[in-house]
């Protein structure tokens, strides 16, 4: 049968990818904050969700099952020749970025996490230039600098005498920095796959998530987090519904993410995932009353001004070697 992505006309593929990513991850972000920052129980016995590894494990299982279904029905003719070690390396950086990003939500609110992750095009670009010898036009670099300035304004916080709060904010930002670095390494791996093996989007999604499931499965068994999570879910069974919805929105969103990576490259994908985040921030502010200062709003405007200029003037990269 024909590949699922080949059923989409070329001129509609990029708008479809953007719309799919926007809709799926809009709801994904709301569910993520509801799960990780919600309070469970009543009175003095209230608990919080602290099982970041297990949450990503469930997410990867659902992603892998969804990708397998797509291959079974739409992509049976494609033969995947990508090396297993490349999938393994990509999954390590991929799940490392996801776990550190999810863990950061325990120390920073969702808008801060989202704006921090908006820097994703920077490591993807820099590592593409240094490791894959890509070249980008000057306008692209200027747009990225504008994004950096906006994010810096957003992340800046005047000193306060609050003790523990200062420590937790710093730790959350460190986790976001780690997540960004790993995002860049993931982008390099994916670019290598599409250039050398013409890896299909569904096969990429399936194998990266299978490796991630294996690694995370060992992690949650070794740390004992799985049993703690099961006990938590037994006390608060309502969370299971939200986690399953979270996994489903992740799987749908990832199918569009990998389609974008395969057809347009990791940098375009990172820019798409960033542009949709402004609306996610607005939803978080409205639904969860997360405060945003005037300086942070200026930073937000700069970030998305840079992205808008990039869409207009920043053309694709040229490869000098691969």
Curated annotation (Swiss-Prot):
Short sequence motif named Di-lysine motif, residue ranges: 318-322
UniProt-listed GO biological process terms = UDP-galactose transmembrane transport
Tell me the membrane topology, using the record's own terms: Multi-pass membrane protein
List membrane-spanning regions: 12-32, 51-71, 85-105, 136-156, 168-188, 210-230, 243-263, 285-305
Alphabetical GO CC annotations of the entry are: endoplasmic reticulum; endoplasmic reticulum membrane; Golgi membrane; intracellular membrane-bounded organelle; nucleoplasm
Which keywords fit this entry according to its UniProt record?
A: Antiport, Endoplasmic reticulum, Membrane, Phosphoprotein, Transmembrane, Transmembrane helix, Transport
Provide the protein name.
Solute carrier family 35 member B1
UniProt organism field: Homo sapiens
What is the name of the gene encoding this protein?
SLC35B1
């Amino acid at each position: 049968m024909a590949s699922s992505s080949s059923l989409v006309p070329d001129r509609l593929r990029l708008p479809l990818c953007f719309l799919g990513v926007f809709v799926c991850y809009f709801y994904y972000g709301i569910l993520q904050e509801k799960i990780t920052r919600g309070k469970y129980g009543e009175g003095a016995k209230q608990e919080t969700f602290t099982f970041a590894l297990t949450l990503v494990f469930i997410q990867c299982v659902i992603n892998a099952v969804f990708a397998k279904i797509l291959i079974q029905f739409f992509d049976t003719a494609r033969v995947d020749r990508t090396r297993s070690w490349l999938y393994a390396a990509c999954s390590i950086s991929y799940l490392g970025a996801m776990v550190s990003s999810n863990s950061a939500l325990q120390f920073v609110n969702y808008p801060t996490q989202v704006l921090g992750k908006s820097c994703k095009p920077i490591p993807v670009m820099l590592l593409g230039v240094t490791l894959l010898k890509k070249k980008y036009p000057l306008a692209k670099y200027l747009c990225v600098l504008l994004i950096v300035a906006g994010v810096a304004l957003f992340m800046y916080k005047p000193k306060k005498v609050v003790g523990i709060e200062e420590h937790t904010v710093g730790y959350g930002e460190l986790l976001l920095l780690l997540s960004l670095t790993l995002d860049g390494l993931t982008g390099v791996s994916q670019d290598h796959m599409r250039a050398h093996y013409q890896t299909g989007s569904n096969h990429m999604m399936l194998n990266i998530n299978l490796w991630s499931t294996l690694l995370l499965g060992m992690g949650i068994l070794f740390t004992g987090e799985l049993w703690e999570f099961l006990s938590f879910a037994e006390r608060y069974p309502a969370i299971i519904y939200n986690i399953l919805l979270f996994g489903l929105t992740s799987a749908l969103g990832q199918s569009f993410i990998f389609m974008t990576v395969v057809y347009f490259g990791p940098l375009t994908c990172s820019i798409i995932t960033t542009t949709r985040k402004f609306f996610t921030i607005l939803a978080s502010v409205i639904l969860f009353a997360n405060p945003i200062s005037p300086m942070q709003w200026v930073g937000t405007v700069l970030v998305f001004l840079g992205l808008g200029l990039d869409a207009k003037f920043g053309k694709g990269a040229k490869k000098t070697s691969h």
